[in-house]
Every structure is written in structure tokens, then in C-alpha cells.
Amino acid sequence: MQNISKILVDADACPVKDEIVQIGTKFHVEILFVASYAHRSRKQQGNWIYVDSEQDEVDFYIYKHAKATDLVITQDMGLAGLLVKKGVYVLSPRGKFVTDEQMDTILYSRYVSAKLRRQGTYTKGPKSFSKQDRQSFLTSLEKILSNYKGIL
């Protein structure tokens, strides 16, 4: 794994912002939260970039600015698919490291679900975010940054 130069966060609906600040600060990694103006919050730690509230503006910003030495935290698998092709590291808020090898399956599943919705059939969405998901994220992020810093 190359050195992680910064963490970019798809922050609009990210449930682990505090954890990102906690672990990123511990490892002295720059953190950049990207959100739409519609999701502006008074409680802000770290560096924030706000973009227009148009659909996918956050994704466009992250895609344009992410480099192969960056880690992006997102639950948007469409964005993740584009980023892994650029060599960007991608981690979901549930602690799953997204790889290029997984993307065909992930995107096909997303396509099938969208097709079913257009036909009026709705599948179950993701389960509620749990304490286990939060812990899995913390463990994964710390492991990634520890490997980068040569600690583990």
C-alpha cells in the first residue's frame, strides 16, 4: 500500500465523521470532508468543502480531486467503482475495503436492484448502521493507516 496523503470523505450521509477525525488525527493524515450546502452543519471538525446541492456534485468533486495516494470514505458504490479504477483506496463506512475485483459484482447487483425498482419491485435496503459496523470501520481505518505509517 502506498502512503496515504489524505482522506476524502463523502460527508453528506456519512455516519462515522467523528471516528474519521479521531483516527485521522491520531495518524496525522489530512482529512477533507466534502458535502453539499444542503448538509451544512455547525458541528464541524476537520477541513470542509461545500459544493452545490445538485445531484452527484459531491461525487464529481471527490472524483476530480482524489489521487492514487488518497483514501476515500464513501457508501456510494458508483463513485467507488470510478475511484478504484484511478487507483484510489476506498473504504465504506461499514469498514469494507472496496477493490477493483469486487466492482463488477457490486455494480451488477446495483443495476439489478435499480431495474427491479423501475418495474415496481422493491428490494430490502441496507440494514441499519450498528455498533458492530462502527467498530468494524474503526478497526479497518486504523489498520489501513497503521500499515501506511509502518506501525503494524
UniProtKB/Swiss-Prot annotation:
Superkingdom, natural source: Bacteria
InterPro entries registered for this protein in UniProt: UPF0178
Family to which this protein belongs: Belongs to the UPF0178 family.
NCBIfam families in alphabetical order: PRK00124.1 (NF001095)
Protein name: UPF0178 protein Bcer98_3021
Origin species: Bacillus cytotoxicus (strain DSM 22905 / CIP 110041 / 391-98 / NVH 391-98)
